[in-house]
Amino acid sequence: MDLSKIAVGVNPPYDLNAIIEIPQGGEPVKYEIDKESGALMVDRFLHTAMFYPANYGFIPHTLADDGDPADIMVVGPTPVVPGAIIRCRPIGTLMMVDEAGSDEKILAVPVDKLHPFYTGVTSWRDLPTILTEQIAHFFQHYKDLEKGKSTKISGWADPDETAEIIRTAIKRYNESY
């Protein structure tokens, strides 16, 4: 896959492309797409017996504070195969830091054209509370047994703050490349 040919989205920061690396419900394996070759690589095996609560990947042509593309989770009716691109609407951000610093996780839903189930969802608050709690719990604990690694959740950012996080990540990418 030539990542340079995949747009940020149709209408960033409100309609984005997410490149999925790990399917929703996926086994405790951390996959990452190699940014140079486009190949799906095993980054590591999670030391905890946990599964990913949402389809997980990144937004192309973005650069987060940690030097990687912006992370994104896309909740949906089914797992999405790794390497697939899904159009989505951001609805919030899980504010998180890990041992290396800021590591926000943008939360999104599929655009209505793909599935109308999330039409009325405009904020992370519109999702079932148990789902947002499961997402926060996963990211609070998925590194627990890895030596030298840690995470801390500080809460959720609303859609407006999320749009600004995405704009900043796009700007940072454009200034770096």
Swiss-Prot record:
SUPFAM superfamilies, sorted: Inorganic pyrophosphatase
Residues annotated for substrate binding in this entry: K30, R44, Y56, Y142
Catalytic reactions on record: diphosphate + H2O = 2 phosphate + H(+)
GO MF annotations in UniProt: inorganic diphosphate phosphatase activity; magnesium ion binding
Primary location recorded for the protein, binned into one broad class: cytoplasm
Keyword set includes Nucleus: no
Cofactor(s) required for function per UniProt: Mg(2+)
Family membership noted in the UniProt record: Belongs to the PPase family.
Quaternary assembly: Homohexamer.
Function: Catalyzes the hydrolysis of inorganic pyrophosphate (PPi) forming two phosphate ions.
Protein name: Inorganic pyrophosphatase
Organism: Caulobacter vibrioides (strain ATCC 19089 / CIP 103742 / CB 15) (Caulobacter crescentus)
